[in-house]
Amino acid sequence: MSAGKIVQVIGAVVDVEFPRDQVPQIYDALVVDERGLTLEVQQQLGDGVVRTIAMGSSDGLTRSEKVSNTGNPISVPVGQGTLGRIMDVLGEPVDEAGEVKTDERWSIHRNAPSYEEQSGGQELLETGIKVIDLLCPFAKGGKVGLFGGAGVGKTVNMMELIRNIAVEHSGYSVFAGVGERTREGNDFYHEMKDSNVLDKVSLVYGQMNEPPGNRLRVALTGLTMAEYFRDEGRDVLMFIDNIYRYTLAGQEVSALLGRMPSAVGYQPTLAEEMGKLQERITSTKTGSITSVQAVYVPADDLTDPAPATTFAHLDATIVLSRQIAELGIYPAVDPLDSTSRQLDPLVIGQEHYDVARGVQGVLQRYKELKDIIAILGMDELSEEDKLTVSRARKIQRFLSQPFFVAEVFTGMPGKYVSLKDTVASFKAIIDGEYDHLPEQAFYMVGTVEEAAEKAKNL
């Protein structure tokens, strides 16, 4: 085990000098002897000096402090022992419940599965959320992005997905909190505890207040734990909240390492960093990883390089819209902007496909008529268009749904709607079977039968 000494500290970047014949390799983990702080090697500068990123606060570090090379990359505990626990980027527990007991530790830097190992699947994953199951269905082993600006409900949607999948499908999930609010992480833990699904979730947090090194690597820590479960032959869910902060941490590290910035100030290695992470999130012949990633959209601009780079890797994109949230419709999913590769009659069946396209057709027509309504009023529309508008407004309200995880705020019990009921309900609305009901009957209900029941009390 070679030993070196600190020669320079600039924020989270620490330069360490080693004897020339014992220079550590890129990604090796070094440990500052006095305080147990882990450093990860990023660059070899020559003359035995390596440039590292600190995986913790570098406050109080001094030059010439002794540093040891562990000779291996950062490794984290994997396996059953991680379930129900909150860990940091190094796999150390932060929930005050003793050490994480596992038989194995895996390096966080791993190669993506080869072509031969990968498998493509077409099986659908039912989420119980109407708008998602109908218009942007998830594939088992697919990647889903939840796009939205600040405060439109990315985290709440994600928590509902975890709750539904854990309760209804009883699968294992890994949640990586990357650069998000500590308060949300805390709420999330208690939410999981209260709904008795904590023993099926591993939680890995590197929150907003952590140094950039932690936020850059914590997604890899969570992914490594998910890969272990996948290689055991399980179907795992990997939740990342928020993938944008992973990019942002990369930008901070890149600037500290002195790289030249590219478009909008992002790191020049943006596409490569994103690809390294995303290519590992895949299904093999032994098991699958289905990932749901929240993507913060800076200033609601989807063409920003960070969300634009993420788009390329996803199978389904769920776009949350501020305009829909303003109408009080939650989940605020934009039904015309959200897409999925699975929305294909060969995968989901002809009936589901026709209903989904029918719903989008009605909403699209309503969008076109809005200008005419704004200028001339409803009375100038033809009878057919009036009917379209009335159905569109019903559909719009029917796309809302009370969430289990939001019961505390809304006072309404959550609803899980099966895919069969979802398709049947929307088909009935498009076919005009419920034209006689007032539109407010469709707001915040589960199935269309519940809407009919609600109408009796209006």
From Swiss-Prot:
GO terms for molecular function: ATP binding; ATP hydrolysis activity; proton-transporting ATP synthase activity, rotational mechanism. SUPFAM superfamilies: C-terminal domain of alpha and beta subunits of F1 ATP synthase, N-terminal domain of alpha and beta subunits of F1 ATP synthase, P-loop containing nucleoside triphosphate hydrolases. Belongs to the ATPase alpha/beta chains family. The gene is atpD. GO terms for cellular component: plasma membrane; proton-transporting ATP synthase complex. F-type ATPases have 2 components, CF(1) - the catalytic core - and CF(0) - the membrane proton channel. CF(1) has five subunits: alpha(3), beta(3), gamma(1), delta(1), epsilon(1). CF(0) has three main subunits: a(1), b(2) and c(9-12). The alpha and beta chains form an alternating ring which encloses part of the gamma chain. CF(1) is attached to CF(0) by a central stalk formed by the gamma and epsilon chains, while a peripheral stalk is formed by the delta and b chains. Produces ATP from ADP in the presence of a proton gradient across the membrane. The catalytic sites are hosted primarily by the beta subunits. InterPro entries: AAA+_ATPase (IPR003593), ATP-synt_VA_C (IPR055190), ATP_synth_F1_bsu (IPR005722), ATPase_a/bsu_AS (IPR020003), ATPase_alpha/beta_chains (IPR050053), ATPase_F1/V1/A1_a/bsu_N (IPR004100), ATPase_F1/V1/A1_a/bsu_N_sf (IPR036121), ATPase_F1/V1/A1_a/bsu_nucl-bd (IPR000194). Its EC number is 7.1.2.2. This is ATP synthase subunit beta. It holds the Pfam family ATP-synt_VA_C. NCBIfam families: atpD (TIGR01039). Keywords: ATP synthesis, ATP-binding, Cell inner membrane, Cell membrane, CF(1), Hydrogen ion transport, Ion transport, Membrane, Nucleotide-binding, Translocase, Transport. It comes from the Bacteria. The keyword Cell membrane applies. SMART domains: AAA. ATP binds at residues 148-155. It is a peripheral membrane protein. Gene3D superfamilies: 2.40.10.170, Bovine Mitochondrial F1-atpase, Atp Synthase Beta Chain, Chain D, domain 3, P-loop containing nucleotide triphosphate hydrolases. The keyword Transferase does not apply. It comes from Halorhodospira halophila (strain DSM 244 / SL1) (Ectothiorhodospira halophila (strain DSM 244 / SL1)). It catalyses: ATP + H2O + 4 H(+)(in) = ADP + phosphate + 5 H(+)(out). It is found in: Cell inner membrane.
